[in-house]
Design a protein with these regions (language model features):
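Short hydrophobic, aromatic-rich alpha-helical segments embedded in or entering the lipid bilayer
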Residues: 1-6, 174-205
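Cytoplasmic membrane-interface segments at the C-terminal ends of transmembrane helices
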Residues: 5-12, 36, 69-91, 120, ...
Length: 231
């Protein structure tokens, strides 16, 4: 059994983890879509009801994945240091942790997409599924970077939540003019288009793929650098 599989099984053995990964996205989608629609009108956005449900699925997977990435990296400092000193090496430790976290965040994204599909139906299901997974992996990267650099649990979790809230209310559909620096800007655009029955442009797909890859590579690099310093 490789280390990534071992790390994943370690988390999945805890029943509460699976409950969070599945129940939170479902609850968020069924309760928050209307709230997002109302906030959009207040902020000058133009988020339709079905698009709001799609965006809620993305944000549900993003919130869980950001939290997962943060606590997976911040709580494993001691164990990762021992693994590095035992000869595993910081690069392989980082690879295993990131892959395990990607598996868990994908489970959360799948639960969010399934809840979205059951609640509203999706005009472009594959587009929505890819965008929800992109949300999850983007915020997994955010959580891992913060968890690798910030040791305090309170400070780190507040940073992740602050980034999340800022991104929610400044992104496409929510604000009259989406902020160009919004982390999930392209993922939100794809989800809104899928929920509204529109086709996503090839340029948006390329941007979404590139942004997601950059987030994961950055998470890997920062985690490996942090593990190397600890060893």
């Amino acid at each position: 059994m490789n280390r990534a599989t071992a790390f994943t099984r370690e988390q999945l053995r805890m029943p509460f983890t699976m409950i969070l990964l599945v129940a939170v996205p479902v609850a968020f989608i069924f309760s928050a879509a209307g709230v997002l629609h109302d906030f959009s009108k207040v902020l000058g956005g133009s988020l339709a009801a079905d698009a709001a449900s799609g965006l809620a699925a993305g944000w549900a997977s993003a919130f869980l994945s950001g939290s997962l990435g943060y606590f997976a990296s911040s709580s494993s400092h001691g164990a990762d240091r021992r693994l590095s000193l035992a000869g595993v090496g910081p690069t392989r430790v980082a690879h295993s942790r990131i892959v395990a976290s990607m598996v868990l965040s994908t489970i959360a994204a799948f639960a969010a997409f399934l809840a979205l599909w059951l609640r509203t139906g999706v005009a472009h299901p594959w587009h929505s599924a890819v965008a929800v997974i992109a949300f999850a992996w983007l915020y997994l990267g955010v959580g891992v970077v913060v968890g690798s650099l910030v040791s305090g649990a309170l400070e780190g979790s507040l940073i992740v939540v602050f980034v999340f809230i800022l991104d929610v209310f400044s992104g496409p559909g929510m604000a009259a003019a989406p902020a160009p620096w919004a982390i999930s800007r392209t993922a939100s655009t794809v989800l809104i288009a899928a929920g509204s029955g529109r086709v996503t442009s090839p340029a948006d797909w390329v941007t979404l793929g590139a942004t997601t890859v950059v987030a994961l590579v950055m998470a890997f690099a920062v985690f490996a650098f942090s593990a190397r310093r600890r060893s």
